[in-house]
Structure formats: structure tokens, C-alpha cells
Design a protein with these regions (language model features):
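Axial heme c-ligation environment in periplasmic c-type cytochrome domains
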Residues: 46-55, 71-105, 113
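The canonical Cys-X-X-Cys-His
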Residues: 33-41, 64, 106, 110
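Electrostatic cytochrome c docking/interface patches
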Residues: 13-31, 50, 60-63
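Post-cleavage N-terminal segment of exported redox proteins
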Residues: 1-24, 67, 74, 98, ...
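Detector for the c-type heme attachment site
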Residues: 38-45, 57, 69
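Disulfide-bonded cysteine motifs in exported proteins
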Residues: 30-33, 87
């Protein structure tokens, strides 16, 4: 019984640690790739683009990956996009050459924002 509880405690701690590292990695990429210059998360960042604080409750992982690498696939460049009642110009640069590992981490981080 004690071994089971210890194993459960260790597994929970590892999951919590991995989640914390994952969130920190995604947040770091969000900053280093310049996303924060235009987008807000929890009150921090720019206001040129939509607030992404809860983007994970609205968009799928696949949609987010497409939006990051090829924003014109979802919104025509130069068009006006209305999200949550606020209008934005579709001017986001694509990150077609972002390494797959970075893209996956960033998109998963954004999807986790619920």
C-alpha cells in the first residue's frame, strides 16, 4: 500500500513538473518568436492582434499550427477579422521555417490556454 501511494505521489510530481516545464517552454517561445509583441496572454503583451488568453478553448491544435505557419490559410492578408467583437487587420507574419519541435511546443502551449 505504501509503495502504491509513493508511486502515485512520484507520478503526480513528475506530471506536474513536466507540465510546468512545458508551459515555461511554450511561454518562452511565445516571447522569443515575437508573438508577445502583438498578442496578449493574461494581460501581458501587445494589442495589435487578438488576446490569446483563452485561445485553447476556441481553437484546435491543428488550427493553431496552421495559423502560426501560414496565417493566410485562415484569414486573407490585409482583410479585417472580427474576434470576440473586436476587429483586427490580418497582418500576422507566417513562421513557415519554425522548427517542428518549437511549433509543436508553441501550439500545444496555446491550446492549453483555456
Amino acid at each position: 500500500m505504501k509503495k502504491s501511494i509513493s508511486a502515485l505521489f512520484i507520478a503526480t510530481a513528475l506530471i506536474f513538473s513536466a507540465t510546468t516545464v512545458f508551459a515555461a517552454s511554450g511561454s518562452s517561445i511565445f516571447g522569443s518568436e515575437g508573438c508577445i509583441a502583438c498578442h496578449t496572454i493574461n494581460g501581458l503583451g501587445g494589442s495589435v492582434g487578438p488576446d490569446l488568453s483563452h485561445v485553447g478553448s476556441k481553437r484546435s491544435l491543428s488550427w493553431l499550427k496552421t495559423q502560426i505557419t501560414n496565417p493566410d490559410a485562415n484569414f486573407a492578408a490585409g482583410s479585417t477579422v472580427t474576434i470576440d467583437g473586436k476587429s483586427y487587420m490580418a497582418i500576422m507574419p507566417g513562421h513557415k521555417h519554425m522548427a517542428a519541435s518549437k511549433l509543436n511546443t508553441l501550439a500545444a502551449y496555446l491550446e492549453s490556454l483555456k
